[in-house]
């Protein structure tokens, strides 16, 4: 049976064209073209200020995802903490299906819960408070009404502050809370969880389920999770 592929945390930006080149290479590969589905679990872009922003980066990525979708490969997207403002307009342009924060898939007979992963990091209370605020629909609507230049400037400032705060936060609070994560998996009746966000690529076997953490992409290393009837395995992008 055709495999499914999972990626997250590419953090594409015009400052790092090499990462965009890696993604385009994968999307154009024969492996991607023969997949049953490709799942992008958030933070595809380093930041997103609205679907109305037109750039060479956004356009080229949407174009290549659309080409893959037009081949009959289903492409799904879950918003991340950096690109949570991606909306239906961009997803339609790219031929992607926008999924909610949590979704349960039947992958080759294994009930699998997928999400970006930031909602699982409940020990980082400051971030969870911030997330609750910026996910308010009314606030998002007001933000998207601002001129594009203002939105970009504000997003840049928020990113700068976030980066500074991250440098002084204890590493453990930026990982998932094990007890909360286990409860979520049980609540959805899943046997396996796939998420990104923490950048700690690993396959864990814990609390009666499998937890797979997707890694982030760098110019010297990027991996893709391949899931098929034999299980799940990380494959270096260089093999595609």
Swiss-Prot record:
Its EC number is 3.6.1.54. GO terms for molecular function: manganese ion binding; UDP-2,3-diacylglucosamine hydrolase activity. Its main location: membrane. Mn(2+) 1 binds at residues 9, 11, 43, 199. One of its GO terms (cellular component) is extrinsic component of plasma membrane. It is found in: Cell inner membrane. The keyword Transmembrane helix does not apply. It is a peripheral membrane protein. Substrate binds at residues 81-82, 124, 162, 166, 169, 197. Its cofactor is Mn(2+). Disulfide bonds: none annotated. Keywords: Cell inner membrane, Cell membrane, Hydrolase, Lipid A biosynthesis, Lipid biosynthesis, Lipid metabolism, Manganese, Membrane, Metal-binding. One of its GO terms (biological process) is lipid A biosynthetic process. Hydrolyzes the pyrophosphate bond of UDP-2,3-diacylglucosamine to yield 2,3-diacylglucosamine 1-phosphate (lipid X) and UMP by catalyzing the attack of water at the alpha-P atom. Involved in the biosynthesis of lipid A, a phosphorylated glycolipid that anchors the lipopolysaccharide to the outer membrane of the cell. This is UDP-2,3-diacylglucosamine hydrolase.
